[in-house]
């Protein structure tokens, strides 16, 4: 019964966010995976909230309106919206329609350097529209369909298959971005190096979060931390 409620409504309590404290949502990953997947058919709106996991939204039928970072985006069928970790957003649903909504553990995928670097480009959100990028949108949507099939199945090695599909989803997006920005990557090597080192720093902190940390312990962090503090100081003075 719980699986059917999750599949139909995206919640075991239709019409509300399950674990919401003020504007903070705690995502309950189910079935021992690092994702929470909804095939949502509700006409209920979701108030302003945020959560540590990232989020992917893609309408199947009808539109879906998301307000994030001061912008309101109306998604059309097979558009794909990626919302970065920690971003405040609200959702307005139409009277009818269906859509995929998926939360994913950022820390789980941050263990892979490629993914950590890619996730740094998601802030505050990334939008792929079928009108502007039909091939990319269709590829990403097809992977979401496969994830749904595994998530609500009883297949053995389901978790492994879901994680493989998630990596495939992000790899498709990342390779597309790399092709689109290849000239920019060559023009701005310093920024790319900072992004790579920042991803390494995030991964190091994630892997040693129970230890006493300092920049002296991990020398590569020294220059990067100084760069970040200088940038923050300039913004503060401005």
Regions found by a protein language model. Give the residues of each.
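Residue-level recognition of alpha-helical structural elements
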Residues: 136, 154-162, 194, 211
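N-terminal regulatory/effector-sensing and dimerization cores
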Residues: 31-123, 153-160
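A hydrophobic/aromatic-rich effector-binding and dimerization subdomain
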Residues: 2-36, 88-152, 171-184
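Basic/polar phosphate-binding segments, predominantly the helix-turn-helix DNA-binding elements
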Residues: 178, 200, 204-238
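N-terminal positioning helix adjacent to the helix-turn-helix/winged-helix DNA-binding module
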Residues: 136-139, 190-201, 237
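Regular secondary-structure segments
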Residues: 60, 141-155, 202, 206-209
């Amino acid at each position: 019964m719980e699986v059917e409620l999750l599949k139909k409504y995206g919640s075991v309590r239709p019409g509300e966010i399950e674990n919401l404290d003020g504007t903070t949502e705690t995502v309950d990953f189910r079935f021992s995976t690092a994702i929470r997947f909804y095939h949502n058919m509700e006409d209920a709106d979701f108030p302003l909230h945020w959560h540590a996991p990232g989020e992917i939204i893609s309408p199947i039928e009808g539109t879906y309106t998301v307000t994030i970072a001061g912008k309101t985006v109306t998604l059309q069928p097979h558009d794909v919206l990626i919302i970065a970790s920690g971003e405040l957003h609200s959702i307005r649903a139409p009277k009818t329609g269906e859509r995929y909504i998926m939360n994913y553990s950022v820390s789980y995928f941050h263990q892979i350097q490629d993914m950590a670097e890619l996730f740094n480009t998601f802030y505050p959100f990334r939008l792929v529209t079928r009108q502007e990028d039909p091939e990319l949108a269709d590829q990403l949507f097809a992977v979401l369909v496969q994830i749904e099939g595994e998530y609500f199945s009883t297949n053995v090695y389901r978790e492994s298959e879901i994680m493989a599909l998630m990596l495939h989803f992000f790899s498709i997006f990342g390779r597309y971005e790399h092709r689109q920005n290849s000239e920019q990557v060559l023009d701005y090597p310093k920024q790319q190096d900072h992004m790579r080192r920042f991803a390494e720093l995030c991964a190091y902190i994630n892997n040693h979060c129970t230890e006493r940390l300092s920049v002296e312990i991990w020398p590569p962090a020294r220059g990067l931390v100084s760069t970040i503090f200088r940038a923050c100081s300039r913004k503060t003075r401005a």
